[in-house]
Amino acid sequence: MRRRLRLRRDALLTLLLGASLGLLLYAQRDGAAPTASAPRGRGRAAPRPTPGPRAFQLPDAGAAPPAYEGDTPAPPTPTGPFDFARYLRAKDQRRFPLLINQPHKCRGDGAPGGRPDLLIAVKSVAEDFERRQAVRQTWGAEGRVQGALVRRVFLLGVPRGAGSGGADEVGEGARTHWRALLRAESLAYADILLWAFDDTFFNLTLKEIHFLAWASAFCPDVRFVFKGDADVFVNVGNLLEFLAPRDPAQDLLAGDVIVHARPIRTRASKYYIPEAVYGLPAYPAYAGGGGFVLSGATLHRLAGACAQVELFPIDDVFLGMCLQRLRLTPEPHPAFRTFGIPQPSAAPHLSTFDPCFYRELVVVHGLSAADIWLMWRLLHGPHGPACAHPQPVAAGPFQWDS
């Protein structure tokens, strides 16, 4: 009965917040939403073997997913040429107020001395309520997973179109509506972190440094942190299994590591970086921003290092610069697929959206809210997937039979 009431409450909150969000989006339909994808690097470090997955079940695996209307992913918002003057004027402004906080997020689950084993931090934008709901009710559910305490936060800035109205009072009105919606969502789920900077692609670096500072202050004893985008699917059981032998007091940052990536000098590119901003021929090694994991010790060290490194407009490259300052090398792992699962040339007919692939991975990037729901149900439903290999192959996260 309690479970039924909780599901009914979640459905009602989803409908109310979704309806309010739809009305506001309709009123602000000319505004553009920021894109939070990572730059495509050139060259990869050699991967290490994937740890075998362990079957696990998250709460409410049988719950019906909410209906998503028009859930086809929208194309990325076009980004104009790099604005030199604006970047140079604002690049040293790195402190913005926290408008919505969750100060008690990491105080355990009521047990004395309780602390999260894993904090999930998801980059999101105000308009992306559907994906936040999908994450909350699937792989990002809070509670105990395989005995580990998991907590969750979403990282947001002020909506890009909130203050762009023709008159000041129109822009301020939209800003007030957005903040009211996010406060209602925060009261319902206690997982929203909102800062006062504009939520744009080039401000993702601000989101990075503000989260590191927040986690160091409000989650000082967290063992591990997973940080990723809202359009990823995470196999939390595999992630916890990978972390089980690791010491949170030792340095660790693991993910889809990109090495020898060269700055893009083409002005039309979203990732265009002029030589005046970065003059070296290649970036330091960095983990793709779609999803990576770090230890509590590395969290605190990064928070300090990133406060001293000059801001850079691409967030995951900036984090690589902070790691370089600490003389830390990110650890590559083949089960972090921040560029999705490539279609094998030898089997063009094979579907890569297959639970038998996903159950052996940790992170897959680039899914819609409906895809996240569907894959979670396929993996954690009452029967589970019927796969040819009951255990993952040792050579990598998956392979195709010849």
From Swiss-Prot:
Residues exposed to the Cytoplasmic side: 1-10
Places the protein is found: Golgi apparatus membrane
Family annotation (InterPro entries): Glyco_trans_31
Any one cellular-component term (Gene Ontology): Golgi membrane
Record-stated family: Belongs to the glycosyltransferase 31 family.
PANTHER family reported for this sequence: BETA-1,3-N-ACETYLGLUCOSAMINYLTRANSFERASE, UDP-GLCNAC:BETAGAL BETA-1,3-N-ACETYLGLUCOSAMINYLTRANSFERASE 9
The protein, known as: UDP-GlcNAc:betaGal beta-1,3-N-acetylglucosaminyltransferase 9
Organism: Homo sapiens
Gene it is expressed from: B3GNT9
